[in-house]
Amino acid sequence: MTSAPTVSVITISFNDLDGLQRTVKSVRAQRYRGRIEHIVIDGGSGDDVVAYLSGCEPGFAYWQSEPDGGRYDAMNQGIAHASGDLLWFLHSADRFSGPDVVAQAVEALSGKGPVSELWGFGMDRLVGLDRVRGPIPFSLRKFLAGKQVVPHQASFFGSSLVAKIGGYDLDFGIAADQEFILRAALVCEPVTIRCVLCEFDTTGVGSHREPSAVFGDLRRMGDLHRRYPFGGRRISHAYLRGREFYAYNSRFWENVFTRMSK
C-alpha cells in the first residue's frame, strides 16, 4: 500500500489563546491514516501562550512564540519549517468542519498526479454570518474580475508547487493570500471539493474591507502578472472600477436604510 501523504497544518496566532486552543483541538480530532504535522507560529503573545504550547501532549512538529513581521511573514516562516507533501494554512480561531476533512482533501487529489504538485480548495462557513462560500467550479476569469474569492483557509497546496511559486508577497498587503492563490492557479487548475471544509472566523481584518481596497488590489494583481479578466488592461480596469463604484453605492444605501429603520 502506498503511504499516505504527510500534511503540514500551519497555524499563525497572536494574542488569541482561546482561538488557538480551538484550532489545535480541531487539528487533533482529524481521522487521517497518514501523518499530520502541526506547526504553530505565534507572534509573541505572552507567557500564557508559551505555557500552553510547551505543555501540549503530544507536542507540535514545531512551534515558536516571538515577534514577526505580520501574518504573511509568519506564514512564510511556517512554510520554512514544513516537511509535508501538502500544506494547509489554518489560522488561530479557524477550525476544520469535521474530523475527516484532511482525509477528504487527500482523497480528492488521489489519481490526479503527485500530491506535492497540486492544489485545491473546498468551501468554508462564515461563522456568525450563516453563510457558505466557495467558487466551484473555479474560473480564472471570474477570479481576476473579483467575482470569485477562494477561501484560503479551505485551500491546500502541494509542497513542490509552493516551492515553485514562492511564498507570500509581503509587499502585497492583506490580499497577499489571493495573490498567492493566483500564482498557484497560473501553474495548474485547482482540484475542488463541493463541501464545507472549514469554519472561518470572520472577526479578522481581512474580512471587512472597503471596496476601494478590494478592487484596487485586483487591479494591482492583474498588472503584476499581466493577466486581465477581459484581455486588455484598459477595459479590465474600467470594469473593476465600475464594480467598485457599484459596491460602494450599494453599501452606502444599505447603511442609509439601516439607520432609517432604527
From Swiss-Prot:
Q: Which keywords, in A-to-Z order, does the entry hold?
A: Glycosyltransferase, Transferase
GO molecular function annotations of the record: glycosyltransferase activity
Q: Where are the transmembrane segments?
A: none
What is any Pfam family matched here? Glycos_transf_2
UniProt keyword Iron present = no
Q: Which EC number(s) are documented for this chain?
A: 2.4.-.-
The record's similarity note reads: Belongs to the glycosyltransferase 2 family.
Protein name, per record: Uncharacterized glycosyltransferase MT1564
**Organism in which the protein naturally occurs:** Mycobacterium tuberculosis (strain CDC 1551 / Oshkosh)
